[in-house]
């Protein structure tokens, strides 16, 4: 099964995340199939979320399942699943 989930990057206490498409058997920071966006939780007062909507729709159409966190982030940007 393929999921759309967060891959943690950055330094200690200064994380940022890439929104990636991964096989569920891969570890969190393991091999990714595709990168579809970024999320900076502590960048500004308004947390920065950006993603390629066409790529997300494409992967959802192929059967990829977003994690709960990614689903909430997409909903914040008014992306309908």
UniProtKB/Swiss-Prot annotation:
GO molecular-function terms, A-Z: structural constituent of ribosome
Matches recorded under NCBIfam families: S16
Keywords: Ribonucleoprotein, Ribosomal protein
Xref: Pfam families: Ribosomal_S16 (PF00886)
Source species taxonomy: Bacteria, Pseudomonadati, Spirochaetota, Spirochaetia, Spirochaetales
Species per Swiss-Prot/TrEMBL record: Treponema denticola (strain ATCC 35405 / DSM 14222 / CIP 103919 / JCM 8153 / KCTC 15104)
Protein name as it appears in the record: Small ribosomal subunit protein bS16
Record has Ion transport as a keyword: no
Family: Belongs to the bacterial ribosomal protein bS16 family.
Any single biological process term in GO: translation
Record has Chaperone as a keyword: no
A single Gene Ontology CC term: cytoplasm
UniProt xrefs under InterPro entries: Ribosomal_bS16, Ribosomal_bS16_dom_sf
């Amino acid at each position: 099964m393929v999921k759309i989930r967060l891959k943690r990057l950055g330094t200690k206490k200064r994380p940022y995340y890439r929104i990636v498409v991964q096989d569920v058997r891969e570890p969190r920071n393991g091999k990714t199939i595709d990168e579809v966006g970024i999320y900076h939780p502590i960048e500004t007062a308004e947390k920065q979320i950006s993603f390629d909507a066409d790529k997300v729709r494409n992967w959802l159409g192929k059967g990829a399942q977003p994690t709960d966190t990614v689903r909430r982030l997409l909903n914040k940007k008014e992306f309908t699943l």
